[in-house]
A protein has these predicted regions:
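Conserved catalytic motifs of ABC-family nucleotide-binding domains
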Residues: 181
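Conserved ABC ATPase "signature" region
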Residues: 81-88, 133-155, 207
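Helix N-cap at the start of a conserved alpha-helix in ABC-type nucleotide-binding domains
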Residues: 196-197
Length: 221
């Protein structure tokens, strides 16, 4: 499914059964510039939804609003509702860090930590209190398998993630997000910096992931 950010009509589903997240009259300002003009949109569970449109149409701004990544940009103001499990994510009293465990993000360019492959997966888990080595090992293996990377790295888990290819790094970033057990994955043009073969691998990975996750992706193509 795709949604053109130049189209303002409402796309709806039965919220009780199918909708993972929706926005109502979502507007985003950067200072005096209104970048998003009141978008109403619903995202179906276990579906890949693509936000498409030309550069500057607000795709990434909208996507980053869904888990409050725009909060860190000075002068940004977001109004309207972002509803996830009957809770407005845009409320100021929301625990943003806990929310981002449920609504994960993968960015345009691969951004692995300058740590080992293993530590890339476990870093956030440890910060949230997980210390059981066996459980961490299981999560690392499961996450890397879901991201179609396990077979390529299972013998090199303690080597630097920076030694991986661009496509492998992006799949590692997907695995890192999966490790937090999110319901929703947001991806901002995740293959734009990759070669065609790596792009195909990432796309195939996302198709397989939609069985367990709701995927919202920004793309030019």
């Amino acid at each position: 499914m795709s949604y053109d950010m130049n189209d303002r009509h409402l796309i709806t589903f039965d919220k009780d059964d199918k909708v993972a997240l929706y926005t109502e009259d979502l507007k985003v300002w950067y200072g005096q510039n209104e970048a998003i003009h009141g978008v109403d949109l619903e995202f179906e569970k276990n579906c890949i939804t693509a936000l498409i449109g030309p550069s500057g149409s607000g795709k990434s701004t909208y996507l980053r609003s869904l888990n409050r990544m725009n909060d860190g940009i000075s002068g940004t103001n977001v109004t309207g509702k972002i509803m996830y499990k009957d809770v407005d994510v845009n409320r100021k009293d929301i625990d943003v860090y806990e929310m981002r465990k449920r609504i994960g993000m993968v960015f345009q360019r691969p951004n692995p930590f300058s740590k080992s492959i293993y530590e890339n997966i476990t870093f956030a888990l440890k910060r949230h209190g997980e210390r059981d080595k066996q459980k961490l090992d299981e999560i690392v293996e499961s996450s890397l398998k879901q991201a179609a990377l396990w077979e390529q790295v299972k013998d090199n888990l303690h080597k630097s993630a920076l030694a991986l290819s661009g496509g492998q790094q992006q799949r590692l970033c997907i695995a890192r997000a999966i490790a937090m057990k999110p319901d929703i994955l947001l991806l901002d043009e995740p293959a734009s910096a990759l070669d065609p073969i790596s792009t195909g691998t990432v796309e195939e990975t996302l198709v397989n992931l939609k069985e367990n996750y709701t995927i919202i992706i920004v793309t030019h193509n």
